[in-house]
Amino acid sequence: MHAKSLTELRAALAAKECSAVELAQLYLKRIEAARDLNAFVHVDADLTLAQAKAADAELARGAGGALTGLPIAHKDVFVTRGWHSTAGSKMLANYESPFDATVVARLQAAGMVTLGKTNMDEFAMGSSNENSAFGAVKNPWDTNAVPGGSSGGSSAAVAARLAPAATGTDTGGSIRQPASFAGVTGIKPTYGRVSRYGMIAFASSLDQGGPMAQSASDCALLLNAMAGFDERDSTSLEREDEDFTRHLGQPWAAGNDAGKPLAGLRIGLPNEYFGDGLADDVRATIDAALKQYEALGATLVPVSLPKTELSIPVYYVIAPAEASSNLSRFDGVRFGHRAAQYGDLLDMYKKSRAEGFGPEVKRRILVGAYVLSHGYYDAYYLQAQKIRRIIANDFQEAFKSCDVIMGPASPTVAWDLGSKGDDPVQMYLADIYTLSVSLAGLPGMSVPCGFGAGANAKRPVGLQIIGNYFNEARMLQVADAFQRATDWHKQVPAGV
């Protein structure tokens, strides 16, 4: 039962093959048995089972919806009433929110059962989930490897089938890269599509929540509940509600032959995504996935995103600048860590922040404060914003000749735990293919498409699919067609 997708579990509940309480108990036992993965940081069986009982009561009355009774885990960046909400930081180690994030509230209103809070890089700053105050997360496929970050706890939980689905956030690739490393499906919606209210902020102009699950169809179900305008979030976009499942299983164009369901689909391949730095085994796996798309009727079209290499310096100016402002609120006064020994108030601020924040967070706060300081704002921050606009324009130019863009989600498979901790630049380079999508505010997703080679044969590879603004339903259709023709998304780590 634990290996079933959300769609399959939904059918099992409808057929009364199991109850919501039985499902919750099953996953809680699995979470306890897999504590060595360190995927979860907060679990409360009483809260979970109370939600499951309420879901069973709804189902018994025939009042349940598409997600009623289905379990989900939440990245610990979403504040959740009744649970600790820490953002992976010592600074918020004992914080309990008096309210639910909009994402959490909407999924609970849809009847979903919260299994717990998943581990993450501190304040979502990291690409490996080694920056957490609660310790590193292990990749279920190879426990010597990282699960990706910053949503590494969520990706590991779904991969190990400790939860059928999880929420994540993506600022520069933090849903797509861990989804790739852990062999699960994850989607970052268009910026503003999903409310950021109650999501502990890293970089406000980039942060976006999204679902992680086994399949594109599962992600579509979740996005139906998560997306929508929220007046409490000033960056939330007013759009008519839509059904993200509406194109699943449908041909790209009416009248397509059943054997060529994607005939007419134009897939853009950026030259810059297939150059130096892309590992040979990842390239071979992506090439095989693209051949599968050709077999389904799609046409491959060369495109160019010439400013791709600038996305790293641009991101690491803009994101730290916004982080330095957002994290200024954590000073040990109202909540969070407070130093035990200090002199005056200013000394308390300094010591509380020095003790409460980890090394990577401190690094980014310092960088952000520097680029925003007098004399450097124009040279760095303003210039980065101008290049950000050029990057977005490059995508729009590319979309004139294609419907979606594809390439690797990461230049390599997951690396060994501890292997890049002393070299932050090498860690940052791992996000080269995801950063520009975030800077442009576009939707993007990662779909499992195979594994590495040799010593990396147990480490998954993800295919990144990028769509134009508000084109999530079509992206999910394209991903779903691939998953109907392959079984990479159904494969599980040994022992699972």
Swiss-Prot record:
Annotated EC: 6.3.5.7
Catalytic residues (positions): K75 (charge relay system), S150 (charge relay system), S174 (acyl-ester intermediate)
Signal peptide start-end: none
Catalytic activity: L-glutamyl-tRNA(Gln) + L-glutamine + ATP + H2O = L-glutaminyl-tRNA(Gln) + L-glutamate + ADP + phosphate + H(+)
Keywords of this entry: ATP-binding, Ligase, Nucleotide-binding, Protein biosynthesis
InterPro entries linked: Amidase, Amidase_CS, Amidase_dom, AS_sf, GatA
Biological process annotations from GO: translation
Record bears the keyword ATP-binding: yes
GO MF: ATP binding; glutaminyl-tRNA synthase (glutamine-hydrolyzing) activity
CC annotations in GO: glutamyl-tRNA(Gln) amidotransferase complex
Quaternary context: Heterotrimer of A, B and C subunits.
Function field: Allows the formation of correctly charged Gln-tRNA(Gln) through the transamidation of misacylated Glu-tRNA(Gln) in organisms which lack glutaminyl-tRNA synthetase. The reaction takes place in the presence of glutamine and ATP through an activated gamma-phospho-Glu-tRNA(Gln).
Protein family membership: Belongs to the amidase family. GatA subfamily.
Protein name: Glutamyl-tRNA(Gln) amidotransferase subunit A
